[in-house]
From Swiss-Prot:
This is 3-dehydroquinate dehydratase. The lineage of its organism: Bacteria, Thermotogati, Deinococcota, Deinococci, Thermales. The keyword Ligase does not apply. It comes from Thermus thermophilus (strain ATCC 27634 / DSM 579 / HB8). One of its GO terms (biological process) is chorismate biosynthetic process. Keywords: Amino-acid biosynthesis, Aromatic amino acid biosynthesis, Lyase.
Amino acid sequence: MVLILNGPNLNLLGRREPEVYGRTTLEELEALCEAWGAELGLGVVFRQTNYEGQLIEWVQQAHQEGFLAIVLNPGALTHYSYALLDAIRAQPLPVVEVHLTNLHAREEFRRHSVTAPACRGIVSGFGPLSYKLALVYLAETLEVGGEGF
């Protein structure tokens, strides 16, 4: 089972700056992730919050709840949440950071991820497919013992 976590403002997908983030809503993204997970033999649980503390608690509790991995879109917390970085580092599960947009093609302040150093990798810039690519990676690595590349 993979926990898919989405941070602040992702509840506005499809309505907030669709020229930047696309027209896929959060509900549609959840359905896509469930379908992709099923294709890959992975169960997924999909959550979203606008609160940094809630996101941190979910990361901290994921292992105890029986999840095998986390797919994380921290939203703007990517760029400044050292508390989230510490939470990722403090738990044993593999985490893949995802972003709908290409961080390096955005404004200067969005080009740096403070959370990335604690993650196995980042998938950025492929819209909803960023989530699928993260799930493909996790399906492959969990299948071979979780070591990854």
